[in-house]
């Protein structure tokens, strides 16, 4: 999907993991077929949006039949690299960093945080889950040796851009940024900003304005 993805809306691409998780749940319940209405009800996404999303990827289903679960699983696995083992590093082992290390994508066998970095002496060398915290000064060598190009950023806001610059120089191609800082990177480095405050404000807005009364 390398070239094709450039023509697909970002919102559609961000929904692919949601579709994959939902379809995988249906598979675990022994269901072998699903239609867009059922997916819509399960994910609270308009069925027209689902059909439009799926249309970007060709014929995934048949009118009157719906979608074959095994076919959808195979497709989504390939599209979101769920068949590949992805090693991830985290920078900043504060409360949020520790929580993410403890969780460590427990429902995703293919994604694992394998490295953690911090600058504080009292944190360096400690083990959280199965990961030992390394000094940040060694990050370039370790990322290169472990072939890691995805990093979760949970540093203090004032350190975020400097850390991001170091990650770019180290060859990182994807950053999941939990800091309030809108870090700047070259166009070939993907950054997804996760601001929990903004997400909560958005939730409250939709609760106030769009909830059924």
Curated annotation (Swiss-Prot):
Lineage here is:
Bacteria, Bacillati, Bacillota, Bacilli, Bacillales
Compartment list: Cytoplasm
The cross-references to InterPro entries, in alphabetical order and at most eight, read: CoA-bd, NAD(P)-bd_dom_sf, Rex_DNA-bd_C_dom, Tscrpt_rep_Rex, WH-like_DNA-bd_sf, WH_DNA-bd_sf
Could you tell me what this protein is called? Redox-sensing transcriptional repressor Rex
From which residue to which does any coiled coil extend?
Answer: none
Q: Which NCBIfam families match?
A: PRK05472.1-3, PRK05472.1-5, PRK05472.2-3, PRK05472.2-4, PRK05472.2-5
Sequence similarity: Belongs to the transcriptional regulatory Rex family.
Subunit and partners: Homodimer.
GO MF annotation list: DNA binding; DNA-binding transcription factor activity
What's in the keyword line of the UniProt record? Cytoplasm, DNA-binding, NAD, Repressor, Transcription, Transcription regulation
Q: Where does NAD(+) bind?
A: 92-97
């Amino acid at each position: 999907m390398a070239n094709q993805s450039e023509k697909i809306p970002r919102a559609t691409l961000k929904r692919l993991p949601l579709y994959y998780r939902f379809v995988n749940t249906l598979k675990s319940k022994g269901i072998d077929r699903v239609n867009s209405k059922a997916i819509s009800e399960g994910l609270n996404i308009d069925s027209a949006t689902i059909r439009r999303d799926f249309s970007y990827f060709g014929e995934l289903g048949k009118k009157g039949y719906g979608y074959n679960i095994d076919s959808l699983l195979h497709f989504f696995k390939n599209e979101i690299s769920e068949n590949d083992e992805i090693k991830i590093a985290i920078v900043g082992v504060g409360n949020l960093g520790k929580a993410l290390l403890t969780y460590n994508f427990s429902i995703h066998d293919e994604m694992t945080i394998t490295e953690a970095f911090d600058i504080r002496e009292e944190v360096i060398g400690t083990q959280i889950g199965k990961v030992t915290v390394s000094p940040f000064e060694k990050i370039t060598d370790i990322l290169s040796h472990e072939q890691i190009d995805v990093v979760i950023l949970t540093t203090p806001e004032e350190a975020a851009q400097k850390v991001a610059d170091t990650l770019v120089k180290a060859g990182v191609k994807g950053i999941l940024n939990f800091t309030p800082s809108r870090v700047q990177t070259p166009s070939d480095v993907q950054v997804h900003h996760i601001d929990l405050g903004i997400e909560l404000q958005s939730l409250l807005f939709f609760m106030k304005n769009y909830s059924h009364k």
